[in-house]
């Protein structure tokens, strides 16, 4: 049978978001959030895409013992009318090497680095914020994974701890996992989501700062 065209259904190469294509995605993110296409929308768009990438790679590693080759030229994306970015990987193949290193190469090197460059250079979002977003996305991915497949903790949690202990995610926050209670993460940088009315993210550093302030 002929192989399906990956562009069917409106999918496009993810690599386009690491160049001028990021502008349209940030603009649409800002429209949906009501913030406009500025730093808040850019940070949120980067965080959302990082979440999808980590979820795909970590799930495969923890449940299937392999990390797929997610090269930007092989992975396709589309933006539905509502909800997060959708990803499509035609003809998946595994990356060689140990799982921790393969995860790092597939996501941190292959995607998060060029994405951070595209967002940071165009929207003046600091590298510290973008690294914190990437770490929050990873923790969010393992949180959802363990909610659905708690038996994966033995493989998934050490992988997350390894990734959070090395650049670019090192020193981005405090990660805790307790069996039966799940995972928690407190950032050391702000994702800027607090600028959306009445909103903060689940890992918000500002909540911690507020608790430390003396009451008057």
Can you name each region flagged by the protein language model?
Residues 62, 147, 204, 214-216:
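A generic "cationic amphipathic patch" detector
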Residues 12-181:
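Hydrophobic, aromatic-lined core segments that form the binding pocket/scaffold
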Residues 187-209:
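Local cysteine-cluster metal-coordination motifs and their immediate loop/turn environment
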Residues 1-20, 210-216:
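Actinobacteria-biased recognition of intrinsically disordered, low-complexity terminal regions
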Residues 8, 172, 190-191:
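Generic intrinsically disordered, low-complexity segments enriched for polar/acidic and small residues
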Residues 184:
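Conserved functional hotspots at enzyme active or ligand-binding sites that engage polyanionic ligands
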